[in-house]
Amino acid sequence: MKRWLGMLTLALVACSGPGPYGYARTYRPIAGEEAATRNAKAFDSAMLTEPGRFADVPLNIFGVVRQRGSASTKGHVYLTLSVRRLDDRNLCASANDERTCRLTVSDVSFGEVAVLIELSPEDDEGEHAVGPGSLLRIIGVLGSDFDSVGGGPIVHGTWYRHWPRGQFVTRAQATELRQ
């Protein structure tokens, strides 16, 4: 009986957290995220004009996937991201229920960036795979290689977090999610 109650309590605590998509009023990092982002500098599209200055600087980028290219021979995928800003507070459908909150980013793009990153198997294929409309937080460095379409340097991702379509919102949805 005690064992069963302990397992039930653990299950309830596990279910009440923000989960992998951060259902909370403010941004909640996942395991390993704080370490991955510790020395990262917030991305500014002006960095693409001076890649030499930022070649060894870890960059922190939030972006909505516009295009997903094919995988390279090393298992990395090529992504084009529309750069967004993270809001200080997430939008929620109910002030009393954090489970109705969704990570919120700007509805305006602050430029585009090309990224090469290795995805986990769960994010590479299947229902919630990274693709157009997904949101990613990328930590990476500017490479010495350049995007053949946009012309800018390619960001080589070292860490990422993924929100599939429908698991985040933009400021444009503030009229629907008022809390």
Located regions from the model:
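OB-fold and OB-like single-stranded nucleic-acid-recognition modules
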Residues: 15-179
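Sec-dependent bacterial lipoprotein signal peptides
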Residues: 1-15
